[in-house]
Amino acid sequence: SSPSRGLGDVYKRQGMKGMWAEAAVNAFDSVDKDFQPNQIDEAYIGSVAFGGGQLGNTAALLTEHTGMQGKPVRRVENACASSGFALRDAWMAIKSGQADVVIAGGIEKMNDLTPERKRFWLGVSGDTEWERLAGLTFPGTYALMARRYFHEFDSTHDDLVNISVKNHYHGLDNEVAHIRKDVSFDKAKSGFMVADPLTLYDCCPTSDGASCVILAADHVVSQFTDDPVWIKSSAAASDYLALHDRPSITQLMATQKAAKRAYSMAGISAKDVDIAEVHDCFTIAELFATEDLGFSERGTGGQFARENRGRRNEGTTCINPSGGLKSKGHPLGATGTGQTV
């Protein structure tokens, strides 16, 4: 296995180089023993909309400002999973023997873009030909999924409200959360309607941020820490982009497939998971993840949320103790590694 150690999250209005440098230095400083960036063999950095700032070659641009000049670097683009896959690539580089110490991270600066450019860079992560050009946005996509779920199962919008309230509650303890405030059930329920049935409080914010983790191989990790965080497994899967191609829009088959593989590799089951950071770009996405990861049975995700079983110290599996994307924020390419440790 390969351990990861060190996490830096930044949600401040500053330049991209400054955001990455702060996150990277936070990660370097968090290593228990002396660590220097020249000890890094490779770097993988996730980003989605860097082209929106008319900048390319992201990884090289950022790493040269954090002491990694001359190192092999790569930008990873895989929509909102970009830095999650950067982490997976870093892990595989170590497992293959090509590197001993690797940094994986992500960055996104969305709030300098106009609303139109934001919508464009978000929209191109979906199906452009059949959805984006027809006017379907991601809030609209998830609203359709939510309405179908309510039609098929014993659930209402109130269950999504509970998820929003929970994540804001968890985010109160996260010093780098984008939206760090308590939200009552009534306020979340009566929020501005974005795409029926989803209100403002069902939607994550558009965030600026950077995050990174440092991975080291088994035979060198003792140089850096006596208490590493071990990566036991990593799995991935994909699905159809367009909703009309999916056999069901009330479950995420890619999540189910990846979870099954990851649990098998690690030798565990969903019942063994105490904490889970899941992708709640919209509250309905967390409800789906709760089911698809096996924390609740199919069709019972609403009940899981209703009974606060994902709330800290109240259920068997704490969901999004960081506040999730809803509270911590969603800087696209930086979200994956931001969820890791």
Where are these regions (language model features)?
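Beta-strand segments within the central parallel beta-sheet cores of soluble alpha/beta enzyme folds
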Residues: P37-S47, P72-N78, V102-G106, D158-V165, ...
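Active-site-proximal alpha-helical scaffold in enzymes
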Residues: E77-E108, P139-D173, V213-H219, K328-V341
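Phosphate/pyrophosphate-binding loops at sites that engage ATP/ADP/AMP, CoA/4′-phosphopantetheine
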Residues: V25-D41, Y149-T156, Q223, A258-D272
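Conserved catalytic cysteine-centered active-site region
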Residues: A49-V101, K109-T141, I179-P205, A237-L241, ...
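Single conserved hydrophobic/aromatic residue that forms the stacking wall/gate
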Residues: S1-L7, Y11
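Short catalytic helix/loop segments, enriched in acidic residues and glycine
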Residues: K12-V31, L62, T66
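N-terminal extracellular/periplasmic Venus flytrap/periplasmic-binding protein-like
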Residues: M19, N162-P228, K232-S238, T316-C318
